[in-house]
């Protein structure tokens, strides 16, 4: 298996137009995979015998006129010697690849992999010194946006690559935005706290004003109620005084028909005693003096008087005597007569009592 690997490595390393490789392709019969599997299981010595048996000694290649580095037919090594050189040749690409990576690191191939401070990522990180950082900070304060000309000037002045300067400005701008957001947040939070405190103070003041308004309304309602009670008491007292004065006036003034009522029975009795013989044929007897019209008043209608006096018990009652034909009054209600005869303008149907005093 190792010999197969050594045999295949020169063909993959050298170009396909290599003369030895061409000679092997021309001389070698088609390779059987079963025989290759058989070689894999039987040792290196058996593998060499099988290769010699199938391949045979390769013919010497003719010298190549265009490639002086290739060996001639006399100097061409055998296949076994070439296989011995394959391990040494196989190690060359690996060392070359390592060397190429180191060259890229020296030449600054890892520009994209930079850390936050502008240094390269990897085993060898290049960090910026203090002077470079100060210069970049001053330029960042002048303007956080980096133009291409300015980037090239800074790179030449600081001995850095333009990509490093651009990445440093990008990271610095991100940190600046974060700090700016924190500052804005703190300022807005302070403003919010101040507004909340002011709002709480206004709410407390509003509550106090509402309480004062309620107290003032209660006082006004109480004062209005007190004034209304005073007015009611004053009106009630005025009414009571007026009623008491009316009662006193009524009690002090005597009834106007009391003297006439007292004198009426005496005069009637005198008239009845003096003219008993000639009074029988008169037929019409005048009423009492209480129904006489006042000096300034008018008369009363006889129909109205009789109608009102006939319905109640307060009217005058008259009795007829068979001997002399005289009429005698039994009882008279002074109040009803006063109410009936007040304000009547018609003349009385009979003569008043004082006009008939000549009968005595």
From Swiss-Prot:
GO terms for molecular function: DNA-binding transcription factor activity, RNA polymerase II-specific; sequence-specific DNA binding. Residues 121-180 bind DNA. Residues 97-109 have a biased composition (Gly residues). Residues 36-55 have a biased composition (Basic residues). GO terms for cellular component: nucleus. Disulfide bonds: none annotated. Belongs to the HD-ZIP homeobox family. Class I subfamily. This is Homeobox-leucine zipper protein HOX21. The gene is HOX21.
């Amino acid at each position: 298996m190792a010999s197969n690997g050594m045999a295949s490595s020169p063909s993959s390393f050298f170009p396909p137009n290599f003369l030895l490789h061409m000679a092997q392709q021309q001389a070698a019969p088609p390779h059987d995979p079963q025989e290759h599997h058989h070689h894999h299981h039987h040792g290196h010595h058996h593998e060499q015998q099988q290769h010699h048996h199938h391949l045979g000694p390769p013919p010497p290649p003719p010298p190549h006129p265009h490639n002086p580095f290739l060996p001639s037919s006399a100097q061409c090594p055998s296949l076994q010697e070439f296989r011995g050189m394959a391990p040494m040749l196989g190690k060359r690409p690996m060392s070359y690849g390592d060397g190429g990576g180191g060259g890229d690191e020296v030449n600054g191939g890892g520009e994209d992999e930079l850390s936050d401070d502008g240094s390269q990522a990897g085993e060898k990180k290049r960090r910026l010194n203090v002077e470079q950082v100060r210069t970049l900070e001053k330029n960042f304060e002048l303007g956080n946006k980096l133009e291409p000309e300015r980037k090239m000037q800074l790179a030449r002045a600081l001995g850095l690559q333009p990509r490093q300067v651009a990445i440093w400005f990008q990271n610095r701008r991100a940190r600046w935005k974060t700090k700016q957001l924190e500052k804005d947040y703190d300022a807005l939070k302070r403003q919010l706290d101040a507004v909340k405190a002011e709002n709480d103070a206004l709410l407390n003041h509003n509550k106090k004003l509402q309480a004062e308004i309620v107290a003032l309304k209660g006082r006004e309602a109480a004062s209005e109620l007190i004034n209304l009670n005073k007015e009611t008491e004053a009106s009630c007292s005025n009414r009571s005084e007026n009623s008491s004065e009316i009662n006193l006036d009524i009690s002090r003034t005597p009834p106007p028909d009391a003297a006439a009522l007292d004198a009426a029975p005496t005069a009637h009795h005198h008239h009845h005693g003096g003219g008993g013989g000639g009074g029988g044929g008169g037929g019409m007897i005048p009423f009492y003096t209480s129904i006489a019209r006042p000096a300034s008043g008018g008369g009363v209608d006889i129909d109205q008087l009789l109608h009102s006096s006939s319905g109640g018990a307060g009217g005058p009652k008259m009795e007829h005597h068979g001997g002399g034909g005289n009429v005698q009054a039994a009882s008279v209600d002074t109040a009803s007569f006063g109410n009936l005869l007040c304000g009547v303008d018609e003349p009385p149907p009979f003569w008043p009592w004082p006009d008939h005093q000549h009968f005595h």
